[in-house]
Amino acid sequence: MGKVYLLGDWAKEGYYKIGVTKGDVEKRIKKLQTGNGGEIYLISYFETDFPFELEKMLHNRYQHIETHNEWFEMTNEEVGGFQKACEEFQESLDALRENYFFKKKHKK
């Protein structure tokens, strides 16, 4: 189980980070905060059995607005739709659970 998160930065309005952690989101924020001049804050996160796949799907969805290192210049509408996008992609990942090749890759 892991979490895909959406973070903001008070110093960079309109820029958001889509990332992943298998641990605690707050600890991840503290780690990212080191060396960052602004204040990073949590907007939302989504728990999933497939955190890295979900993160990749989100990065692909928003690749046209990626600025650097998993940071994206997003509109308020895109930020507001983050949770819904996660849910939609999770449905796709859930449907793949029974696919032989997907199951083989994701054995626990």
Q: What are these language model-derived features?
A:
Residues 1-108:
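Non-catalytic accessory segments flanking enzymatic or RNA/DNA-binding domains
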